[in-house]
Each structure stands twice: as C-alpha cells, then as structure tokens.
C-alpha cells in the first residue's frame, strides 16, 4: 500500500472532504413525507407535489417526443457548439475509466475472469429553479452512455407554464436522451424506484 503524507494545510482539506453532511431534521421529515405520499397515492401525489412546490399543474408527466425533437430549433449556434465541445470532452474523460471484461483458461480447464455488464437503465435528475443546469445533463448522462447503459431517463422540474428549460431540454436532445419527465424534487427521484408515474 502506498502511503501519502499530508502537510498540515492539506489535512484541513482532507478533513473537509471526509466530513459527513447532516441535513436538518425538518428537510429529512419533509422528504420522508413526500416519499410516503407518492408510494401510497402514486400519480395523484406527484401531481400534488408539482403544484405545491413548482406551481405547475401537469396532466402528463412525460415530455412528448415532438417537443424533444424540436428542442434545438432557434438556439444560439455558440451555445450548441459549446455544448458539443463539453459533451465530447466529458465523453473522452470517462472512456478512460471503462473497465473491460476479461477471461482466461487455466491449464486444468478452469475459466476465470470478470464480466463487466452495464445496468439496464439509469435515471438522472437535473435541478431547476432560477438557473439552468445543462451541465448536469452532460455530467450525469454521458458516463452512463459511455458505460453502455441502453436506457437513460431524465427528470427535471417544469416552470409554471408547464415548459422545461430550453437549454436543459436542448442538451438532453443533443446527447440523445429521449425519455424525459417534467417533475422535480423527491417525487421525481421516486420515478426511478417505482412504477409510478409512467404516463405517455
């Protein structure tokens, strides 16, 4: 094992990195209530959360494919170029991390090895609010794509008019995400762990 000695200043950084985050109890309780409500009441609870927290009434959670396909129309070419560059660089970085399957046969016929298999699906969450986070789309989705995950699902909150942030949506379209849900918060994260919601 390699031993690395840290200077006193570096130790302060290490202590910060190793610090366990503690959420305030009221936040934990609120998230727990949302989870219990969605598990018990499904889509109705998700709609209620979207209305309470995001101020939007949604009839359908899943974004229609035609809206995804049209996401790049009218965007500043400089933004699209920057997006393509960022996605390319992040892809190149994560390609170096990809583990390969390997097998070997011993003289006695025993086969040894490691089979690396991607997950069947990955869910990513892109925060909303007053700012747009297209970088969150790339940073979360591209590693899964490089790993060979065949299905990537994205959730992001809609604005009060029911629309998604155009930059976030365009980024998802550009890198190839085709399954997108308009919802935020803890209720959105439940999308990845339960059959609700699955509307078209």
Which residue stretches match the model-derived regions?
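Positions that flank functional sites
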Residues: 53, 159-160, 187
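N-terminal Rossmann-like NAD(P)+-binding subdomain of aldehyde/semialdehyde dehydrogenases
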Residues: 1-120
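Single conserved hydrophobic/aromatic residue that forms the stacking wall/gate
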Residues: 192-200
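Conserved small-residue-rich beta-alpha loop and adjacent elements
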Residues: 104-170
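Short acidic/polar active-site loop segments enriched in Thr and Asp
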Residues: 42, 150, 178
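A glycine-rich helix N-cap at a beta->alpha junction
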Residues: 171-187
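Predominant activation on well-ordered alpha-helical scaffold segments within soluble catalytic domains
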Residues: 32, 47-50, 87, 91, ...
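Active-site-adjacent beta-strand anchor residues
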Residues: 39, 155, 182-183
């Amino acid at each position: 094992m390699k031993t690395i000695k840290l200077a006193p200043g570096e130790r302060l950084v290490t202590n910060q990195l190793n610090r366990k985050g503690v959420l305030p109890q009221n936040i934990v309780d609120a998230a727990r209530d949302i989870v219990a409500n969605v598990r018990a009441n499904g889509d109705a609870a998700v709609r209620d959360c979207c209305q309470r927290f995001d101020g939007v009434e949604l009839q359908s959670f899943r974004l229609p494919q035609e809206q995804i396909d049209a996401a790049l129309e009218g965007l500043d070419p400089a933004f699209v170029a920057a997006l393509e560059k960022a996605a390319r660089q992040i892809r190149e970085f994560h390609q170096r991390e990809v583990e390969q399957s390997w097998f070997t046969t011993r003289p006695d016929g025993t086969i040894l090895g490691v089979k690396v298999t991607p997950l069947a699906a990955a869910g990513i969450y892109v925060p909303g609010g007053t700012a747009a986070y297209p970088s969150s789309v790339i940073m979360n989705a591209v590693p899964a794509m490089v790993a060979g995950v065949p299905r990537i699902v994205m959730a992001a909150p809609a604005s009060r008019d029911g629309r998604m942030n155009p930059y976030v949506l365009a980024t998802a379209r550009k890198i190839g995400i085709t399954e997108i849900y308009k919802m935020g918060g803890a209720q959105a994260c439940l999308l990845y762990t339960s059959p609700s919601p699955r509307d078209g």
